[in-house]
Amino acid sequence: MIMLYWRYSKNQCETKSEENMLENFIKEADMPQEVIEKYEKQVPAELVQIWQEDGLGTFLDGYLKVINPDDYLELLQDSYFRGGVAFPMFVTAFGDIITWEENAYVGIVQYNIQDLDIMIKRMDRFIEYVDDEDFKDDYFDIPLYKKAVAKHGELAYDECFGFVPLLALGGSKDVEHMDKVKVLEHICLMYQLAGGVFDD
């Protein structure tokens, strides 16, 4: 399902700053300068600023991670039918990749259910709405994440929660059937065993 997110508010002309979006940011490491220089003309200025000022780490109470795109770009291109026009920006606590697409849209590639959504147009709008309750309800599974953390503990930077067995292979979407796994390896596993996200 493709859905563009928009809601009127009397403050809609005001943009939330990157600092507000990442106010609970936990830094893991600096983004390598060579990565910034390699991609700075291909991605939104807001993302470059995040790379420069915050680096690699987690935000939204650990649900989202700022990633090194070099770690995910080839996998995204191989496993996603829009991979040629998509750029990996973040990953979620359940192994979804949040993308910048066609130099215009923020999308989410959901390997667990082999689906995608175009979340919103413009990076500044994503920044404005990412902590909005309705936006999170539409695109993230915060309640399940909180239950998973309560049962299995907080995730390390390189981890996500993986369903065992995979949802695409008949697994159950609950905390009793998940474990902590390495994010990149788990996305590769979902792609290899269940297939990627393709336009079929």
Segments the model singles out, each with a brief description of its role:
Residues E128-K182:
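An amphipathic alpha-helical core segment
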Residues I2-I108, F161-D200:
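A surface-exposed partner-binding patch
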Residues K27, P32, N112-D115, D141, ...:
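Serine/threonine-rich low-complexity intrinsically disordered regions
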Residues N68-Y72, Q110, I127, L144-K147:
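Short, surface-exposed, charged/polar-biased interaction segments
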Residues V109-D141:
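Compact, glycine/acidic-enriched structural inserts
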